[in-house]
Amino acid sequence: MSYPNIDLLYLSEEDMIKAGVTDVVKCTDCMEELLKLLNKGDYRMGGENGNSHGCMVMFPDEPEFEGMPKNGPDRRFMAMPAYIGGKFKRAGMKWYGSNVENREKGIPRSILMMMLNDKDTGAPLSLMSANLVSAYRTAAIPGVGVKHLAVKDAKVLGIVGPGVINTITIQTFAALRPSLDTLKIKGRGQASIDRCIEFVKKECPQFKNIIVCDTLEECIRDSDIISFATSTPKPGQPYPLVKSEWIKKGALFCCPAAIDFEDEYLIKDAKLVVDNIKLYEAWAEEYPYPTFKTICILGSKFTDLHHEGKLSKEAITDLGAILNGKAVGRTSDDEVIIYSVGGMPVEDVAWGSEVYDYAMEHGIGTKLNLWEKPYLY
């Protein structure tokens, strides 16, 4: 960049696809590098503690002003700023609005954009469509867990919630565990189940058996890997509960959505892993105990159990610590591992940066001029 002139690159969703945003293996490699950096501490997110998930705008159940949105499932706006160091050394922010009624209009529940910025000047580098950045990095963080924590000969994958995220998760897991040959699906709507099956048959032919399950129990029993990616429950609605007798020895649970386990099982019978323990500590500060009632991600139950004195802090293992050789991963083929995935804006900045760099190198996207010379400075 030749100052004072500032140009930025606009990347549409089509541009992002051309630049490789849907490459599940590269995205997983990127997220693995990111998790190592998180464990080392070479990053910042929002808030005084530098670990905030973001700033959320929510709405009242009964708005008193005409035109103000009304509270509902996944009804929010959110800004998610971050800086990530290492080879990335970029700042950025993902911004999105979410409304489940969008699907009736043929558009996604959440519509996301991201801005990447130069870490020194703050100058904008790129404004990009971020739905695919977010979807693929959301699948890739569990993917890192599968790569390092799942049994090597895993054959049966169970998914709960066959929406966009779990559909991409299936593709990611299939690339990382070619031994997978059976897919079990538990969903609520036939349309999403049908879309998922159509995608899998086209993109993941290694699955020779596809089973649609009527119950959560049916999906979990005999599954080597289980992924949960469901919509946020309504306030006061109980989270789906996994019973210990359903769980196969050696199973890996990837949990980026609302799910619950029996306290005793978490305390005594499973290895508990999180994507970044500091994220859950930040949530515990922002939403005091019982945090799990507000934040439906399972790692918040881990911190609640610690708050109650039922679980030691040492019982919660950071995946980045495993990747950096500071902690032990899977210890046997019978060990059950429960992996909580919270989702962080550093992930968007990291994967968005790699896609942006490729786009710049290959002439993809539209250059926009901010100014040749600033009017005020």
Identify what each model region corresponds to.
Residues 1-137, 141-143, 153, 346-349, ...:
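N-terminal ligand-binding/catalytic initiation module
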Residues 2, 13-21, 259-260, 264-375:
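Adenosine-phosphate binding glycine-rich loop
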Residues 149-156, 179-180, 248:
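Short helix-loop-beta connector
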Residues 162-163:
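Glycine-rich Rossmann-fold phosphate-binding loop(s) that bind the pyrophosphate
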Residues 176-203:
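NAD(P)-binding Rossmann-fold cofactor-contacting core
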Residues 177-178, 242-249, 264-268:
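Short, conserved loop/helix-junction motifs that constitute active-site signature segments
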Residues 221-222, 233-251:
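Rossmann-fold NAD(P) dinucleotide-binding segment
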Residues 230-234, 257-258, 277:
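Short glycine-/small-residue-rich Rossmann-like dinucleotide-binding loops
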